[in-house]
Amino acid sequence: SSMGEIWGYRKVYTIGLLLFSCTSLACALSDSLFTLIIARTLQGFGAAAIASVNTALIRIIYPKRFLGRGMGINALVVSVSDAGPTIAAGILSVGNWPWLFAINIPIGITALILSFKFLPQNPVKAVGRKFDVTAALMNALTFGLVIAIIEAFTHDVHISLIIAAIVIVLFCGYFYIRREERQAYPLLPIDLLRIPLFTLSIITSVFSFIAQMLAMVSFPFFLQRVLGRDEVATGLLLTPWPLATMVCAPLAGILSEKMNAGVLSGIGLIIFSGGLFSLAELPAHPSDLDIIWRMALCGCGFGLFQTPNNSLMIGAAPESRSGGASGMLGTARLLGQTCGASLVALMFKLFPGHSMPAALWLGSVLALIGAVISFSRINRKA
């Protein structure tokens, strides 16, 4: 996102698309685990470039009064990715695993052509500003260790190693934040985190994505191991969630222009929490319909939450810092998803016989906490 403010969001986005497409081909052609890991790592850089400036581009494309609609359309498109298990199951039913990556190539090329043709340039670029390599390295070290520590709690890692990693994180994080506080355009947007509305939106987003991943990771195991559904049936039963999100996200975008976005996000999270609780309380032998309406309820709540929350977050930042806000949005999502996936592993370890309900109950509680935080934004202004 910092590169987007310097070079232009369009350039960073198209470079990310090109890298993602090329590395998808490399993944498909990989002949060993080592080459696949290298290709996937580079693919992650491409995906990060795309995701980090996506919201900033939306802010440029849509007038302020229609920003909610733009976010809604974007959330609709993003929700298609939640149908990944269904699409993957379909691909694997007719082909081998390399096709999971090969399918990205024509999609990436098409997106690249459209990006060159239609994406706008930044209205204002940071003149005379250089990319802070030192801050980037400190950022990677700090957040990398945070994710490693979260993962370590779910594995049999010796406590002394975890404590050592925590000490290193605190040490690096302290000096990283102190350094960024002295920068006019910090890589870690300390200036944006001083805006209460922005920070509350970030925290709400983290809680929501933790809750989402608690369901998305644990529930497929329940469908296959407990209910005995095959891969295709599992993918199809997960599909109502993204479909409901696709319907509700654009609607939330329109509603966010007419009502308080904090209220709308809070209502969405309450619905989401109810959906997770209903999944946790599934009967012992549920029918497909029992599962479908509960998944749709989760997707509906998440769709109503995501669009207005993202609109509040990006709208709270100055236009010149849209890149930093967009990057923080992606960071909040990644942090929440990482924590959620790790918590699922912890639930499997602590509650081996009831891991799925435990994960969903926890997700329901976290979604409610997110709703409380969301409602606290009602009278706040950027």
Predicted regions and their residues:
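A residue-level signal for alpha-helical anchor/packing sites in multi-pass solute transporters
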Residues: 56-57, 61, 91, 118, ...
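Hydrophobic transmembrane-helix bundles of small-molecule transporters
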Residues: 94-204, 211, 237, 363-364
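A gly/Pro-rich, aromatic-decorated transmembrane alpha-helix motif that marks the paired
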Residues: 76-95, 144, 148, 335-351
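Transmembrane-helix signature of multi-pass solute transporters
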Residues: 19-29, 107-114, 171-175, 247, ...
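12-transmembrane solute porter fold
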Residues: 103, 134, 160-165, 181-381
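Hydrophobic/small/kink-forming positions within alpha-helical transmembrane segments
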Residues: 25, 48, 79-83, 140, ...
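Helix-loop-helix hairpins in multi-pass membrane proteins, especially solute transporters
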Residues: 2-134, 152
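Hydrophobic alpha-helix/TM-entry signal in multi-pass membrane transporters
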Residues: 13, 20, 36, 131, ...
